[in-house]
């Protein structure tokens, strides 16, 4: 396994700072401790406490929010990282793999990536994501504007993004932007949030660890088979493309490859949410522990004494009632289920990381660590299938998701006058903070948060010297990003209340 040197991957350089050096182990550790402080103290992490995990607008604090889920993922990620490093130590590979001064940073990068992994998610989870994409797809008609030549079927509602005869280069840009704006994705928004909006100036290694997918949002070409898993979702937007190119150079990553520690973050998320969703469903009385056991055993098939299902789920179920008076049967069951599941899946994830280390290190390993034909992965899949069949399609969940979809779609409708303004008028509104001819738009603009307005202004200034046609296209792009940034950054409750206020429903 020559060629594996984690010093080439774990870079402590920052995009907005001068190149720095750190010689001893503690100096390197301090750099990543600074990352921890920036992340933990960021507003994006605080907002996770009022964002949906499964149950939107949940008042029961025992049911998980995105924040409590992320804390659980952080702990599992730390455990997997420690397991991997311990195996490297036992095999006397620490120095050979360039990790002798990077043990603490290795763990810290994984932990903080786990804590951050959901910060780009909009209100109401995947339904909020769908609402944003559906709203923009209807107006962008990305498939009607593919390529460089106008099509008779093109139904784009934005004049500046309509393809025009004889404008090949501009049409390619228009097509890119139409696809990009129609592909809002929480993982891509996380990259935008930490770099362009919050400007946390994190190390390249720390941000590389949350670059879960490697496809740009504007991508419309066929996906290469060698990377069809890594590119199954958008990983970053056109707005952050230059930054991602810098990151790849700094971390020695080929195009479409992944940062090696990202595989650990992904495995920790898979392990954590599969148990959490089921525990929350029991807390919400969607089914009982006994019913849950029946659902899981049906998905597993024939259970034989000593198989993995029996050791993990069966062993937890057999503990019911054994500690009456000390804890409830539900708490008892999930305590043992969690311990048993983590105890089996964490070593399996660590082993998969090590067995596939050359491909994992290069970032070309085209699957998840917990995606193979093993009994451990079968167990994980049955947890997920039970959640899909019996939790996500529960009437209460579906009703709240429909409400969330309507809220996000409605907010986009409400703020759409800002997108309909001519470029010159919007530019004047930004410069003067008001526009006499656009009183409604002025008031909507005032509701946007300062950090989002500043990010737009900075982007607009950066493209100021482009030819006028290019400038108008990019200006609209960053204006649309401004609206997406603002609405996707809301908490569930704020989005719900804002929608009601602006619809005069209260």
UniProtKB/Swiss-Prot annotation:
UniProt cross-references to SUPFAM superfamilies, sorted A to Z: HD-domain/PDEase-like
One Pfam family it belongs to: HD_assoc
Domain HD residue range list: 66-274
Protein known as: Deoxyguanosinetriphosphate triphosphohydrolase
Subunit structure: Homotetramer.
One GO-annotated biological process of the protein: dGTP catabolic process
Enzyme class: hydrolase
Record's function text: dGTPase preferentially hydrolyzes dGTP over the other canonical NTPs.
The enzyme's E.C. designation: 3.1.5.1
InterPro entries: dGTP_triP_hydro_central_sf, dGTPase, dGTPase-like, dNTPase_1, HD/PDEase_dom, HD_domain, PHydrolase_assoc_dom
Catalytic reaction(s) noted: dGTP + H2O = 2'-deoxyguanosine + triphosphate + H(+)
Family: Belongs to the dGTPase family. Type 1 subfamily.
Species this protein is from: Yersinia pestis
Gene Ontology MF term list: dGTPase activity; magnesium ion binding
Protein keywords: Hydrolase, Magnesium
PANTHER family: DEOXYGUANOSINETRIPHOSPHATE TRIPHOSPHOHYDROLASE (PTHR11373:SF32), DEOXYNUCLEOSIDE TRIPHOSPHATE TRIPHOSPHOHYDROLASE (PTHR11373)
Cofactor: Mg(2+)
Lineage: Bacteria, Pseudomonadati, Pseudomonadota, Gammaproteobacteria, Enterobacterales
Recorded coiled-coil stretches: none
């Amino acid at each position: 396994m020559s060629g594996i040197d984690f010093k080439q991957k774990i870079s402590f350089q920052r995009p907005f700072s001068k190149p720095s050096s750190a010689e001893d182990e503690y100096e390197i550790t301090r750099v990543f401790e600074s990352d921890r402080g920036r992340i933990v103290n960021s507003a994006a992490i605080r907002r996770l406490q009022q964002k949906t995990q499964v149950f939107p607008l949940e008042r029961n604090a025992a049911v998980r929010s995105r924040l409590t889920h992320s804390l659980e993922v952080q702990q599992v990620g730390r455990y997997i990282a420690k397991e991997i490093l311990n195996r490297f130590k036992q095999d006397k590979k620490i120095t050979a793999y360039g990790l002798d001064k990077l043990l603490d940073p290795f763990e810290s990068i994984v932990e903080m990536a786990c804590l951050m992994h959901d910060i780009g998610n909009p209100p109401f989870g995947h339904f909020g994501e769908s609402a944003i994409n559906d709203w923009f797809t209807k107006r962008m008609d990305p498939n009607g504007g593919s390529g460089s030549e106008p099509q008779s079927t093109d139904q784009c509602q934005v004049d500046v993004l309509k393809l025009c005869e004889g404008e090949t280069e501009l049409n390619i840009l228009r097509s890119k932007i139409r696809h990009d704006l129609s592909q809002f994705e929480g993982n891509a928004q996380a990259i935008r949030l930490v770099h362009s909006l919050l400007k946390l100036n994190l190390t390249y290694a720390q941000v590389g660890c949350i670059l879960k997918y490697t496809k740009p949002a504007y991508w419309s070409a066929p996906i290469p088979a060698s990377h069809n898993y890594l590119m199954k979702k958008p990983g970053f937007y056109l707005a952050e493309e230059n930054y991602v190119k810098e990151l790849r150079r700094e971390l020695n990553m080929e195009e479409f490859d992944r940062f090696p520690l990202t595989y650990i973050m992904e495995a920790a998320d898979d392990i954590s949410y599969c148990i959490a969703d089921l525990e929350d469903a029991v807390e919400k009385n969607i089914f009982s522990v006994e019913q849950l056991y029946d659902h899981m055993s049906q998905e597993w098939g024939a259970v034989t004494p000593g198989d993995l299902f029996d050791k993990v789920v069966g062993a937890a179920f057999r503990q019911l009632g054994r500690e009456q008076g000390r804890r409830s049967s539900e708490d008892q069951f999930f305590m043992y289920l969690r311990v048993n599941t983590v105890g089996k899946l964490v070593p399996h994830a660590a082993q998969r990381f090590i067995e596939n280390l050359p491909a994992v290190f290069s970032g070309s390993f085209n699957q998840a660590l917990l995606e193979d034909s093993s009994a451990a992965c079968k167990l994980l899949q049955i947890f997920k299938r039970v959640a899909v069949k019996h939790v996500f399609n529960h009437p209460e969940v579906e009703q709240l998701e429909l409400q969330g979809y309507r809220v996000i779609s409605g907010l986009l409708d409400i703020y759409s006058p800002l997108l309909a303004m001519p470029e010159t008028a919007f530019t004047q509104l930004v410069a003067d903070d008001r526009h006499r001819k656009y009183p409604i738009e002025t008031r909507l603009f005032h509701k946007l948060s300062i950090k989002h307005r500043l990010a737009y202004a900075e982007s607009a200034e950066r493209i100021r010297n482009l030819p006028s046609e290019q400038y108008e296209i990019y200006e609209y792009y960053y204006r649309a990003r401004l609206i997406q940034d603002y609405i996707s950054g809301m908490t569930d409750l704020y989005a719900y209340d804002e929608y009601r206020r602006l619809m005069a429903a209260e």
